[in-house]
Amino acid sequence: MIKPDALPQFLRNKVEENDAFGLVEGLCQLLRSSPTEKISPTLHLFKFILKNDKELGCSVSKLLCGWLCGLRLYPLFISSGILTRGGFGQEMKTRIYERFNPSFKDINDLRDIFYLLFSDKNDARWIDAVPLKTWRGVFGVLTRYTEQKDRERLKNHIESEGLFAIEMLSIWIAAEDMDPELMRMEPSLLNADSPFVALHHEVVDWVAARRQSIVFDDSHLQVMFDQCKALIIGLQKRGAVVGSSLNTAYLLERLSQTLERLETLMAIFVSNRYLPRRILLLTGCFARAAAERHSISRLWKQSSGLIARSVTQNAGDHGEHYITRDKKEYWAMFYSAAGGGVLIALMALFKTYLGSIIDDKVWKGLAEGLNYGFGFMVIFMLHFTVATKQPAMTAARFAEAVEKNPQGKTLNMKLAQLLVDVFRSQSVAVLGNVVVAMGLAALIAFVYQHQTGEPLMNSEKIAYQLHRIDPLDGSLWFAAIAGVWLFCSGIISGYFDNRSNYLNMRMRLAQHPLLKKLMSEKSRVKFANYMHENYGSLIGNFCFGMLLGLTGLVGYLTHLPLDIRHVAFSSANLGYSAVSGQFAYPFFLQCIAFVLLIGLVNLMVSFSLTLWVALRSLNTEIDSWWAIWHEVCQIVRKRPLSLFFPVQLDK
């Protein structure tokens, strides 16, 4: 490792050895090992040494110029920072294999040189620590020491490689026009005048004009760029409608990156005088991309964000149905939740029955999961509502509002109003679930005791149910786990909705050979339409039920504190316990407070997790939660009843 005071001798040694790569590598190592505050001074020292030793400066610039003229540049231009063509699966396997058996690096290929120079994941730290002005100063000194003929030779080499890279990128973009996935999503790509193909024709003419130093009217070229960008955005949105796989999302992201790189290179080579600022910015992008070239975590983070967008988009579409904005929607939500409360009370009773007839923990957990899963599916099919299912949907809708609106006070007011609408909707849904589930449970317990003369639950079962809702006995932690499963069920629903669109489930089922034998055409089409529209919701509800039922079993088998508490089932169990145990009124109110606390944790955890994922998938963020909270307080101060009831809704 070289020291700053040994830098002059190091430069002389590398010049004598004719080792340009070693010179650049040593300089990068010196900058990498320097504290952040000393990185710029170290680069200033390098510039100072060259300025004050003309002979050394001329030797270094001649060495670097000759080295660059002998390198292949275009592989770096067309690949660095752009997703590979192999797809997510192939790229993941390549990066994992690279960890165990690194590939050979060719120091005559600038792409490999960048990887060797910037192989540390923290290299972005020192790259970003150097102002652009400092880099321009260093290259300015090197340029002054370079002879005119060498400058011309380097310029011609860079231009030749750059124009070739531009041609290759335009060919790639035009070739994607025939990708089966893109044609499935947008059949108009089959037209001969596709924007991708038209852009390629314009780029070919532009490159020919540049090689002949002819002025080129690029007005139509810019129109083609705009149309290609609009088409890619349209395809990304179309994916949420017709469904998209991870590979499709990966393809669209690569197409977008390729188009952006093409535009950047054309902006650099548009004239004979290259703007140093643009070249340096592009070089910085190459350096950061090289540092992340074999990063598995970076690939996973990038790729998972691609598919998350379409998943949360499907969740957001459902979320709009769970937000009430007038009295009609408010009472419809209440009646829907009340219907859900009826089935929840029966599901809780059946769970108690299962516990009394099944002793084996594994079979009991499986039976409880099936009880929950099929119960939630029936609730959904009857158009009833489970209150805590909505946050996973409404959070995605909230994130969409952040993306669609500009930043500022208007946005904060809209988000605050949306939060108030969501809170009111959740409140009435919880109220419908809790009141009806608890009331029906109490009625069933009363009728049972009246008919048999014995309470539905004995003292041991009552004590067990009270223990389950006590905040001091971990009920809030278990409620948080249920909130995580609520979040997961929303993601699962979104994924399978996307999958249904991607597979064109409607047409598959309508033309299924077996269904043709079993059902009439009318029934088959109706069944196909229903499954296509509700595929994700049915699977999401079933998976949510299984997760609830099996969590306690996993906790039992692993001896970990794992279980679930759900507000609706806790309220039903409280109804059975209250009548069986003849609770005193104050104690009963305390138990209701505990149940509502469980519901609050269910809602907060599921909403927060889904909002975080939705914001990330949309690549957006909320500037100030405090400002939104201030707007919420303003709304509550002006229209306090609108927080809970469908009144004072005039904006």
Task: Go through each PLM region and give its residues.
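Juxtamembrane/interface segments at transmembrane-helix termini
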Residues: M1-H44, I49-E55, S59-K62, I357, ...
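Soluble N-terminal domains of membrane-associated systems
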Residues: M1-V311
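Long, compositionally biased intrinsically disordered regions
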Residues: E186, R211, L231-A267, R278-S297, ...
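Catalytic cores of large soluble enzymes that bind and process phosphate-bearing ligands
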Residues: H220, G243, N247, R254, ...
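Hydrophobic alpha-helical transmembrane segments
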Residues: N272-A289, I307-E320, G369-F380, V422-G432, ...
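Core alpha-helical transmembrane segments of integral membrane proteins
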Residues: T312-T410, V430-H450
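Alpha-helical transmembrane segments and their immediate juxtamembrane interface regions
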Residues: S336-G339, L343, M347-F350, W363-H383, ...
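Generic detector of multi-pass transmembrane helix bundles and their immediately adjacent loops
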Residues: F374, K389-P391, E400-F569
